[in-house]
Amino acid sequence: MSAAALKNDVFLRALLRQPVPYTPIWLMRQAGRYLPEYNATRARAGSFMGLAQNPDYAAEVTLQPLARYDLDAAILFSDILTVPHAMGLGLDFAPGEGPRFARPLRTEDDVARLAVPDMESLRYVFDAVAVIRRELDGKVPLIGFAGSPWTIACYMVEGRGSDDYRLIKTMLYARPDLLHRILEVNAQATLQYLNAQIQAGAQAVMLFDSWGGVLADGLFQQFSLAYTRKVVAGLIREHQGRRVPAIVFTKGGGQWLEAIAACGCDAIGLDWTVNLGQARQRTGDAVALQGNLDPMTLFGGSEAIRAEARRTLDAFGPVGTGGHVFNLGHGISQYTPPEAVAELVDEVHTYSRALHAK
C-alpha cells in the first residue's frame, strides 16, 4: 500500500521526544458510546462483535471522533479480547454484563491445549487497519493496540471481568507453571498480532495493561512486566520509512514507573493518580509520557475542564527534552457529554501552544 503523506505527525514526534508546536491529544475509547453517531452505527451492525469484525463499520467508528474534534491521532476500533477469541475461548458481549468467555481456562488440560492462533483468523482487524489508513488519507497517525499478556490472561482465566481476581490469583499462587504457560502463549500471540497491525499500516502501537495494578510488588514484575517486555522487544520498530513508537499503559502502575520505562517502550501511559511532573523526574525524560486527566473531569463543566487541562499541562512543565501526549487517565465514560471533549481539545491545543512557544 502506498500510504498518503502524513499531514499531522505531532503525535508521533511527541512520542519520540522531538520538538513539537503544541501538545497533541487523543483519548482512550474516543470512538465509543458517548457519541450518538457511534450508537447509530452499532445499531446497524447489530452487536459489538458485528461492529468490530466488519472492517467498514470499524473504520467508520474509528473516524467518527475525528470528524467532530481536532484530535491528533486515530485509534483502531477493536477490543483487547480479539486475540483470546481467536484462540477459541468463545467471546460474547452480554447486554449490561460486558465481555465473557464461553470456554475459560480452568484446568491443566485447558492450558495445555492453548496455542497461538493463526493470524489469518484476525484478518478482519488488519483489513480494518488498511481501510482506516486509506480513509484517513494522511490526516493523522493511526494507533494499533493489544491487551498485555497479563491483562488478557485475567479475562481468559476468570471468564469475565472480576472484582477480586480470585481465579487467576489462585492459579498464580497454586500453579504458577500454568499461568506462565498462558502468559508465554499470550506474549507470542500479542507480538504477532501487533506486528501484523504495523504491517497493515498502524503507525504507533499501544499495550493496555489494564489490570497490572492488581498485582503485588514483585509479582507485577514477574507476571506482567516480564511478558510486556517480551512483546516490546520483538516489535517492528521501523515501517514505511518511519519509527513506529510503542506505548505501554499500566493502570495502577504508578509505583513501578522506573521499571516500566526500562521495558523498551517509547512512552508510558499514566493513570490520573500519578503526578506528571514527578513521573517525569523519576523517568528522567528517557520516555515520553501520555496522560493523564481524570475522565470524570469531563462532567465538571467548561471552566473545570479547562482549568484541569491547564493544570495537567503545567504539571508536565516545559517540554524541553521530554515528550507529552495529552490523554485521559483511563477510557472516556459512555455518559460523557460530547461537547465536553470539544472544550478539552480546544484548551489543550490553545494553552499548550503558548507553553511550547516559551
Curated annotation (Swiss-Prot):
Originating species: Bordetella petrii (strain ATCC BAA-461 / DSM 12804 / CCUG 43448)
Purpose of the protein: Catalyzes the decarboxylation of four acetate groups of uroporphyrinogen-III to yield coproporphyrinogen-III.
Family note: Belongs to the uroporphyrinogen decarboxylase family.
Top-level taxonomic group: Bacteria
Record field: catalytic activity: uroporphyrinogen III + 4 H(+) = coproporphyrinogen III + 4 CO2
Main subcellular location: cytoplasm
GO molecular-function terms, A-Z: uroporphyrinogen decarboxylase activity
Subunit structure: Homodimer.
Record-linked SUPFAM superfamilies: UROD/MetE-like
Protein name, entry field: Uroporphyrinogen decarboxylase
Compartment list: Cytoplasm
